[in-house]
From Swiss-Prot:
It comes from Hydrogenovibrio crunogenus (strain DSM 25203 / XCL-2). Pfam families: MinE. One of its GO terms (biological process) is regulation of division septum assembly. Keywords: Cell cycle, Cell division. NCBIfam families: minE, PRK00296.1. Belongs to the MinE family. This is Cell division topological specificity factor. The gene is minE. Prevents the cell division inhibition by proteins MinC and MinD at internal division sites while permitting inhibition at polar sites. This ensures cell division at the proper site by restricting the formation of a division septum at the midpoint of the long axis of the cell. The keyword Flavoprotein does not apply.
């Protein structure tokens, strides 16, 4: 297989480059978690409590995110509601 890779000009990615790519992904993930407001988990719990009073929902289905658009912070809530 290595001979075919050599003949076809395909090179394996060096371990240093692979480690660098993995580290960049890890850092990006940590930065995105760190930028989330501290109050978001508590807000999620409270929103779930209010919705659960009226409808039976799967708590894992609720997704809350805060994004910035046009200079404003936007709270986005995604939830699949059951059929009646």
């Amino acid at each position: 297989m290595a001979l075919l890779d050599y003949l076809l000009g395909q090179k394996k990615k060096k371990s240093a480059n692979l480690a660098k790519d993995r580290l960049q992904i890890l850092l990006a993930h940590e930065r995105s978690e760190r930028s989330a407001p501290e109050y978001l988990p508590k807000m999620r719990e409270e929103i779930l409590a209010v919705i659960s009073k009226y409808v039976t929902i799967d708590q894992e289905q609720l997704q809350i995110s805060i994004d910035e658009a046009n200079g404003f912070e936007v709270l986005e809530l995604n939830l699949v509601l059951p059929d009646k």
